[in-house]
Amino acid sequence: MPSHADPSPHPAELVSMLESMMLIRAHEERLASLASPTAPGTCTAVGQEAAAVGVVRALEPRDRILTNHRSAGHLIARGADCGRLIAEVMGRVDGYCKGRSGTLHISVAELGVVLTSTIVGGELSLAPGVALAQKMGQGEAGAITAVFFGDGAACEGIFHEAINLAVTWRLPLLFVCENNQWQAYVARRETMPADPAATAALGGGRIAAWAAGHGLPTAVIDGNDVDAVHAAARAAAASIRADGGPRFLELVTYRQRGHFEPDDQAYVDPAELARWKPLDPIARAAQRLLDEKVIASGELSHLRERARATVAAALKFAENSPWPDASELANDVYA
């Protein structure tokens, strides 16, 4: 992939990305702690915050996003309000979709988030259409589409269909595979061949190799390194804007919690989980900023407390939001 990345982010931007990751973590851990049925079926992406923040922060307001059932990180990185997100999960009227979507079907038009899809690979079926509309003149000139999906979706036929269309029609589409090593309750190693030797040590690369087979420029990135993700995403977005063609990023990360909440992860090898824990993206980013003296330990504690306070206020907002009126049950239902 040619390098069109802007210079390294300003220290203030690095701190901002760390704070965004902390807010995402605090938000999802609070949701996970809520007793069912208060937040039923919540799917978290704890451990994958660098992938969300690194890519979304590389996009522009004119761009469009399609994502999946682990969507909170992408939404919060894009600027979504935690209170409205929690209200949506709780089925309250102040949620972004008036309490109808939960975390699995949410759409936030004002942020350019077209949809989240609970259907594995569902976002891949629609992303080429959004990018085609942009190419045909809909929306602002130079805008691109980013679609987030997991390694499970890469095992669906729509993965190849979407890439084939994007390459053939030269669509302004950024494919972002968050390879978190798990497909619901099944380990990735049980569903696809071994990774290429060049990227095996990183823990990924097979999915990017599939994409490259279609003639798509690809990159395999340490998805727990927010700086590396951000740089790769900026380069990919700049390349798309420059030549109009698609790009592909495989972000190698790890799902630290279960498939959904509650899930005791009894199927996960404790030794494997222990190997990934030291690679936690928030801890790594924080330590780097401390080592480089960009931030002091006291400031780091302040960021954590501010994230927790924001989520506490968000939960209170959601709890105080009214329930929808029964008379509106069929509103906004078109099929």
How would you label these PLM feature ranges?
Residues 26-33, 37-169, 190-193, 199-203, ...:
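Cofactor-binding active-site loop characterized by glycine-rich and histidine/acidic residues
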Residues 43, 66, 174-176, 220, ...:
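Structured core elements
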Residues 1-40, 61, 284-295, 317:
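Cofactor-/ligand-binding subdomain signature composed of acidic, glycine-rich
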Residues 7-8, 17, 41-45, 76, ...:
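Hydrophobic alpha-helical scaffolding
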Residues 135-141, 199-235, 278-304:
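Conserved thiamine diphosphate
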Residues 162, 168-173, 178-242:
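Ligand/cofactor pocket segment of small-molecule handling proteins
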Residues 2-3, 239-335:
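Glycine/aspartate-rich loop-and-adjacent alpha/beta segment that forms the canonical ThDP
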Residues 32-34, 62-67, 176-179, 209-216, ...:
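Short acidic (Asp/Glu) and glycine-rich catalytic loops that position anionic groups and cofactors
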